[in-house]
Amino acid sequence: MNRTVQSYASAMFRVLKDDVYSPAVVQQQNTFAFGKTSSLCTDNHSANDQCERGENVTESSQDHVKRPMNAFIVWSRERRRKVALENPKLQNSEISKQLGYEWKRLTDAEKRPFFEEAQRLLAIHRDKYPGYKYRPRRKAKRPQKSLDADSPILCNQMDVETLHPFTYRDDCAKTTHSQMESQLCRSQSLILTNSLLQKEHHSSWTNLGHDRVTLDTRISADFPFYQSLEPGLSCAYVQY
């Protein structure tokens, strides 16, 4: 490509230097340059097509050795043709599913001749290709589609990020953290309140029991004094 551009530039320089402007000469040079660039483009397109199909250039030049057929392939060759003729509207995937279902329903006696044929083909394949090793072809990785700079999704995302500097995840994390802190504070306050109520209740019961014990002790201590008084005075003293 660089040589073509250089030859074209040198030709134009010679025309301008000689002060001879001939449209025929310029057209001839343009045609020559265009022919070379078009051939290069076609070669590149063919190579790109092979890469997109997953074919290697070095492997395509060599003869690909097929794997020996197994019993199912031997049986499905003729059966696939019959099913395709009987049901022309069926797709290849649907035919394959039907063949797999039919193969499972066959008995061992019905499968035996196809296994024998597969063994015979395997022996022939070993004799023909003694150093054969199965090497599956690698599929070419398709490039992931990236969003264009003018796509509405990307523009909307950029606008949102411009208006709101904090992302959605950060806001959610902060909101969740604040909610957890508030719930923790509430739970701690409830626990503290319950503990204070329990202590107050326990202290009230303790004081009440202590007062009752003190009253009983005082009554038992003053009991001889109550007996020495007259009945009316003792009742009045107790009521007082």
From Swiss-Prot:
InterPro entries: HMG_box_dom, HMG_box_dom_sf, SRY, SRY-related_HMG-box_TF-like. SMART domains: HMG (SM00398). Acetylation of Lys-141 contributes to its nuclear localization and enhances its interaction with KPNB1. Deacetylated by HDAC3. Residues 65-133 bind DNA. One of its GO terms (cellular component) is cytoplasm. It is found in: Nucleus speckle; Cytoplasm; Nucleus. Keywords: Acetylation, Activator, Calmodulin-binding, Cytoplasm, Differentiation, DNA-binding, Nucleus, Repressor, Sexual differentiation, Transcription, Transcription regulation. Interacts with CALM, EP300, HDAC3, KPNB1, ZNF208 isoform KRAB-O, PARP1, SLC9A3R2 and WT1. The interaction with EP300 modulates its DNA-binding activity. The interaction with KPNB1 is sensitive to dissociation by Ran in the GTP-bound form. Interaction with PARP1 impaired its DNA-binding activity. This is Sex-determining region Y protein. It comes from Capra hircus.
